[in-house]
Every structure is written in C-alpha cells, then in structure tokens.
C-alpha cells in the first residue's frame, strides 16, 4: 500500500480518455495507444508532484477476468475484475485511503464525484484535471529549460578539454 501521508490521485482512465480531446482522437483509432499516452502523461505528473497515481480502467465485462494491478513508470495501473466497474474500485479505494492520505479523484462522473466527496476525498473534473496536467507540463518544461541554460557553459567547457 502507500506510505503513510503520501498524497494519492485516483484517475478514472476511460472517463479521462474520452473527455480530453487529444486522447479521444487517438482512442478513435487505437484505444491501447490512448491508454499508453495517458500512462505517460500521468507518469510525468507523478514525478513532478511526488504523489501516488492509481489509474483505473474498466475491465468488468471481460468474462472470467480476475482483474490486475501493474506498476509501470511509477504509476499503478488497475484493470478491474469481472463485474467490478472502475467507479466501484475508485469508491472502495478512496474510502480505504482517506484516513491516512490526501486523496484526489479525477473523473467527470457526477455521481462518482458526490460519493468520493462523501468519503472525504477531493474531486477534480476531467477538465480541471486536464488544466492541472497542462500547467504541470509547462512547469516541467520550464525546469528543463532552466537546467539546460545553467549547464550550457559547463557542457561545452568539458568538450573543449
């Protein structure tokens, strides 16, 4: 489980994919590619914010599916088991984590938002989460640029030696 006190983000994967235009366009051609793009985006987000990210995808319609949890690029990726929706998994997990962690849930499902808010979690609509992710991307780009500027002279000095 998570280290005590660490902040957690629970992300309703398909809800986000079909709410964000850039992912929705990719999903229309290749859903697996859209999932991969979201994983990459959230991996960068996790690294910058130093939080735990749990990305949840529905797999409840897959007959006999036991569900799975994988750790890739620092984020937990959950595929729900047969007869368990992403919403049900997010509700259960936000309830379990609420006591020892600051939990934020990213989804535009209104009922889901009300339920997790009742558990004491914070909620983010897909649009609000997209804005936060874009701001994070800008901050990461600025840090990289600042690092590159600071090290430009050092790298050329080493090459000349």
Question: Predicted regions: what is each one?
Answer:
Residues 1-11, 15-161:
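Nuclease catalytic cores that cleave nucleic-acid phosphodiester bonds
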């Amino acid at each position: 489980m998570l280290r005590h006190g660490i902040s957690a983000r629970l992300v309703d994967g398909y809800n986000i994919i079909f709410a964000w235009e850039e992912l929705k366009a990719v999903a229309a051609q290749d859903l697996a590619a859209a999932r991969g793009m979201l994983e990459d985006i959230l991996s960068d987000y996790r690294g910058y914010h130093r939080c735990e990210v749990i990305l949840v995808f529905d797999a409840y319609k897959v007959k006999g599916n036991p569900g799975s949890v994988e750790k890739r690029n620092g984020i937990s990726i959950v595929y729900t088991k047969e007869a368990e929706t992403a919403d049900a998994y997010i509700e259960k997990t936000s309830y379990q984590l609420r006591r020892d962690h600051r939990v934020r849930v990213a989804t535009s499902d209104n009922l889901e938002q009300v339920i997790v808010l009742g558990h004491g979690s914070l909620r983010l609509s897909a649009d609000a989460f997209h804005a936060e992710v874009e701001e994070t991307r800008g901050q990461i780009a600025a840090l990289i640029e600042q690092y590159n500027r600071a090290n430009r002279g050092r790298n050329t000095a080493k090459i000349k030696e």
